[in-house]
């Protein structure tokens, strides 16, 4: 492999190995940027050489009819032993949504809430990375990431209802204004050393810092009562570094292994209007992976052992420091027969730890108007085990995969909601109160005939949930997706997407059936490309049913997502 291709390989490895550093929304431009890199590396042969400036990249500009703008740029500089890559993306959007929430209680009373939500969103991401190879087998890398989000939400609500005896409840009016800024900074330092006979040694230090101030002003009044103004300010500070060392062996007679040690710290502080919450974690994760490959057989397994310390200080007399020692396992076996058939069987055991939001013990205004949230510091991790089998057929015109998975989750962290009659708000918290299991079938395929291609997918799931806040009856979910595409003369490409979701059932709520339809057209003009999207043509209402011990809540959302998106890209 030439030196140039080696640099490209390192760039691709960066996108994979440092996803936590460069975690950004997947958008059209990132797919364009990937095609830029693919143009230089085809079948291990250099198909196109950059010009004498050693500079190449691209830019994308898009805008939608409902008030969204999405400019992005990507540039790479390559010369001798130096590779410099930078990416910048900006997203401005505005969305108006109407929502009706109906709550029926077992006591016989009911509440109706009508809300209009206006959301303004500004997002900016920047990342740059420098790779330097002083000599063969040694690569030094440094990188920085900066991300800034600003979200402003204005909600206006009218609340009505009836008491259990049929009397009309006094109407309540509420206006809520929420503003939060989210600044994330990251830094990466990495060194890779290749040994001729042993393999590759990778060391990495990743630093992340998050600053997120949130301001919420909620003004509530009744038709014949005084107004009540509630003001809340919350600021989050989070420093989250980790250090990693990994040894990857070369392949000997089909065998290879890797050993990794990763140490992570998280130091978080949340200052609210009247409270302070400190959330500190320490983790030591050891991973051992082994793999064997043969002409018709491939085996691999990864064993992980983690010592995890969760230290919570809510400035109360109770002690909330917890120590966990957990093991996780992933195994997979793949059998191939012929050039077209492949069968894979996998077993996975994993841990899901509660988030800081679920642990935060103080009552605060939630992300939705009329909802209060309080965490639970007694939450424990949930454990899951999954067994999955899949079959893949790959032909010249048709590729399809069928999979069947069974998953069992214990000590599930489930959401529980209740209604506070005094504040006229729903109060949401979390409990380790449930076990659930599901059986999931998926079929996915791609059909190719000349200029026509179509990708399709079907998913079905049977869920059995056993929690104190919801019934344990079996519940089915299913969905179907199709994406036909055709290439026309003069470099035109047309595609459409159809998505049908049946009654989509989750652990304690379900969504009604819906049909979504979008259309896309692309025109290629040498280094330019023109894009046009018609998004969410049908724009269906979204209905959700949530069941708890003492109430059933129905939410009807009327989004304003139908729009025309136009854009262009340029690569050099």
Describe the residue ranges of each PLM region:
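Bacterial N-terminal signal peptides
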Residues: 8-16
């Amino acid at each position: 492999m030439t030196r140039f291709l080696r640099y490209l390989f390192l760039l691709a490895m960066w996108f994979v190995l440092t996803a936590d550093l460069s975690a950004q929304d997947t958008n059209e431009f990132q797919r364009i940027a990937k095609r830029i890199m693919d143009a230089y590396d085809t079948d291990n042969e250099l198909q196109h050489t950059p010009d004498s400036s050693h500079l190449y990249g691209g830019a994308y500009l898009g805008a939608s009819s409902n008030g969204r703008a999405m400019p992005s740029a990507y540039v790479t500089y390559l010369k001798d032993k130096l590779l410099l890559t930078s990416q910048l993306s900006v997203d401005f959007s505005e969305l108006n949504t109407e929502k009706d929430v109906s709550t029926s209680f077992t006591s016989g009373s009911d509440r109706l809430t009508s809300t209009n939500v206006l959301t303004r969103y500004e997002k900016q991401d920047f990342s740059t990375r420098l790779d330097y190879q002083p000599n063969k087998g040694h690569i030094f890398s440094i990188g920085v990431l900066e991300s800034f989000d600003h979200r402003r939400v204005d909600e206006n609500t009218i609340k009505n209802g009836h008491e259990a005896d049929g009397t009309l409840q006094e109407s309540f009016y509420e206006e809520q204004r929420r503003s939060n800024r989210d600044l994330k900074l990251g830094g990466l330092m990495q060194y890779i050393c290749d040994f001729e006979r042993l393999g590759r040694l990778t060391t990495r230090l990743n630093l992340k810092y998050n600053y997120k101030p949130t301001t919420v002003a909620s003004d509530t009044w009744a038709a014949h009562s005084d107004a009540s103004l509630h003001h809340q300010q919350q600021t989050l500070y989070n420093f989250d570094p980790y250090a990693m060392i990994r040894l990857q062996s070369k392949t000997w007679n089909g065998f290879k292994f890797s050993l990794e040690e990763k140490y992570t710290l998280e130091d978080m502080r949340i200052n609210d209007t009247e409270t302070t919450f400190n959330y500190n974690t320490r983790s030591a994760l050891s991973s051992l992976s082994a793999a064997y490959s043969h002409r018709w057989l491939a085996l691999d397994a990864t064993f992980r052992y983690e010592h995890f310390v969760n230290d919570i200080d809510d400035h109360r007399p109770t002690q909330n420091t917890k120590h966990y020692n957990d093991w996780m396992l992933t195994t997979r076996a793949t059998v191939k027969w012929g050039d077209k058939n492949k069968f894979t069987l996998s077993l996975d055991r994993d841990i899901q730890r509660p988030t800081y939001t679920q642990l935060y013990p103080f009552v605060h205004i939630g992300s939705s108007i009329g909802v209060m949230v309080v965490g639970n510091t007694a939450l424990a991790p949930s454990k899951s085990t999954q067994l999955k089998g899949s079959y893949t057929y790959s032909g010249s015109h048709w590729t399809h995969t069928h999979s069947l998975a069974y998953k069992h989750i214990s000590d599930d962290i489930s959401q529980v909601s209740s209604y506070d009659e005094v504040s006229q708000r729903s109060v949401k918290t979390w409990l380790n109160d449930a076990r659930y299991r599901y059986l999931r079938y998926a079929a996915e395929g791609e059909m190719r005939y000349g200029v026509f291609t179509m990708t399709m997918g079907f998913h079905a799931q049977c869920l059995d949930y056993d929690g104190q806040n919801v019934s344990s009856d079996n519940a089915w979910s299913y969905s179907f997706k199709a994406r036909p595409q055709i290439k026309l003369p003069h470099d035109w490409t047309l595609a459409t997407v159809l998505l049908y979701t049946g009654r989509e059932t989750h652990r304690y709520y379900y969504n009604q059936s819906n049909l979504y339809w979008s259309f896309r057209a692309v025109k290629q003009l040498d280094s330019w490309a023109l894009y046009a999207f018609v998004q969410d043509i049908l724009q269906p209402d979204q209905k959700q049913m949530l069941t708890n011990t003492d109430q059933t809540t129905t939410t009807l959302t009327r989004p304003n997502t139908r729009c025309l998106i136009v854009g262009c890209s340029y690569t050099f």
